[in-house]
UniProtKB/Swiss-Prot annotation:
Record-level GO BP terms: fructose 1,6-bisphosphate metabolic process; fructose 6-phosphate metabolic process; fructose metabolic process; gluconeogenesis; sucrose biosynthetic process
HAMAP family per UniProt: FBPase_class1 (MF_01855)
Binding residue positions for Mg(2+) 1: E107, D126, L128
Top EC class, one word: hydrolase
Alphabetized NCBIfam families for the sequence: PRK09293.1-4
Record note on quaternary structure: Homotetramer.
Co-factor: note: Binds 2 magnesium ions per subunit.
Catalyzed reactions per annotation: beta-D-fructose 1,6-bisphosphate + H2O = beta-D-fructose 6-phosphate + phosphate
Family annotation (SUPFAM superfamilies): Carbohydrate phosphatase
Compartments in which it is found: Cytoplasm
PANTHER family documented for this protein: FRUCTOSE-1,6-BISPHOSPHATASE-RELATED (PTHR11556), SEDOHEPTULOSE-1,7-BISPHOSPHATASE, CHLOROPLASTIC (PTHR11556:SF35)
Name the UniProt record assigns to this protein: Fructose-1,6-bisphosphatase class 1
Length: 340
């Protein structure tokens, strides 16, 4: 018996009007005009969205094609690589080379992959963020950063030289958040047309938040100042902060980013006393940088606890960094604790 057929979509009760929104491709074409670097940037983003559309099909099939979480190797930092990690890397590299980018830095490769010799942009990407959630139905994502390729080491530039950045969140819908330096735009993949349609423009973070996203299990390993910040938040309205806080942790930076961009909040994944966590855990070039770019465009902030992420000059391709991002007011408050 066929349980799912080619039926018409569910009609929302009380809100059955279909949104006829501009596609991201059309927006990028208008933004790029005849500018060569902008055209190269637009083509790179389109390639990533094409890859995201293909990747989500594999994610949605779960274990049917095989085990997406099968361990197949390790990356440069000895992090375990799953089958879908490597498959995602191969997919995006193939599409970005075809789009004419100069080089690609991926979490799943030790060194940048060479592309078109005269390419104008370089793309740093985490092909599948949150792969620890593979097979669990929990959030996954793709996150990327686009730099000008006009220097010898495009991936060792500070984040303030980014041309564009974005992420794709694979959840109960496939959502895109991106910016080309003109505000944050949200879009959603229409599975029928295969196109991403813009749903919100000029997205802004709220001025205040009571939502925190962090891994509470590592609290005992945090610095004294950070432990004090967490303890004061846990005390809620009876403590020095004078209000209650909610705690969120999705186990995928893209998932937490997407929630914070919509609802507000503050995320932190900072350095702690555990071996291997002395400088934080997230990668500066293709995780912290694009998040910081988007946070800034949405009126928020992103730091490593003391320095703006976008001002940090990477020393290595896969350099790790502490990361705090979100609502500016709360980040400033955390910063006072961080330096204690």
């Amino acid at each position: 018996m066929t349980l799912v057929g080619n039926f018409s979509p569910l009609v929302l009760v009380g809100d059955s009007d279909r949104v006829e929104a501009e596609t991201v491709g059309a927006y990028l074409d208008g933004w790029a005009g005849h500018d060569k670097v902008r055209l190269a940037t637009a083509n790179a983003i389109k390639a990533i969205l094409s890859g995201a559309g293909r990747l989500v099909g594999s994610i949605a099939r779960g274990y049917l094609p095989g085990d997406p979480g099968k361990l197949v190797g390790v990356n440069s930092d000895q992090d375990q690589q799953k089958s879908i990690d490597v498959g995602s890397h191969n997919l995006f590299v193939e599409l970005l080379i075809a789009a004419g980018v100069a080089s690609i830095l991926s979490e799943e490769a030790d060194l940048p992959v060479a592309g078109k010799a005269d390419g104008l942009v370089a793309v740093a990407i985490d092909p599948l963020d949150g792969s620890g959630n593979v097979g669990l139905g929990a959030p996954l994502g793709t996150i990327f950063s686009i730099f000008p390729a006009d220097v010898e080491e495009p991936f060792l530039q500070p984040g303030n030289r980014q041309i564009a950045a974005g992420y794709v969140s694979y959840g109960n819908s496939v959502d895109l958040g991106f910016s080309v330096g003109e505000g944050v735009i949200f879009a959603t993949l229409d599975p029928v047309s295969g196109q991403f349609h813009i749903t919100r423009r000029n997205v802004k973070l709220p001025e205040r938040t009571s939502d925190l996203a962090f891994n509470a299990s590592v609290q005992r390993h945090l610095s004294a100042g950070m432990q004090a910040y967490v303890n004061d938040a846990f005390l809620g309205k009876d403590g020095p902060r004078g209000r209650n806080f909610n705690m969120r942790w999705l186990g995928a930076a893209v998932g937490d980013m997407h929630r914070i961009m919509q609802r507000g909040g503050l995320f932190f994944y900072v350095n702690d006393s555990r071996p291997g966590y002395e400088k934080g855990r997230l990668r500066l070039v293709y995780e912290a940088n694009p998040i910081a770019f988007l946070a800034r465009e949405a009126g928020g902030k992103a730091t490593d606890g003391s320095r703006p992420i976008l001002d940090i000059v990477p020393q290595t391709y896969h350099e790790r960094s502490a990361l705090v991002f979100g609502v500016a007011e709360e980040l400033d408050i955390l910063g006072e604790y961080f330096v204690k």
